[in-house]
Amino acid sequence: MDEITIKALQKFVTKFRDDRDWRRFHHPKDLSMSIAIEAAELMELFQWHKQSMGDRKEMEKEFKKYIQDQQLIQRIQEELADVLIYCLFLTDVLNIDLNEAIKMKIKMNEKKYPIQEVKKRDKKRE
């Protein structure tokens, strides 16, 4: 599958779901819980890994270790896909246009985090 829009991706995953008659199990509460569970599985892949604070060269070395570990990358991909699939199921059930939701949220973040106030800053704003 080549590049795909969010809408097309949503149709792709909902067809998979609907072909198996699973929509009847997709209550928003359960889908939101599934998103959290899958996100926790993603977090678990990074648990106990060293994290360099501030030293850019050390951070770059750590990133290279992640990228070179193909088994870890495969597991990360699977968990990211699970999170996104459940997000797409939830947007379908609640009839949310994810394209519009993302655009709206980015506009809100642009106001909250103006470039001139946050770019090249090392510390989080108060």
Feature-to-residue mapping (PLM):
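Flexible "arm" and connector segments at domain edges
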Residues: 1-80, 84-126
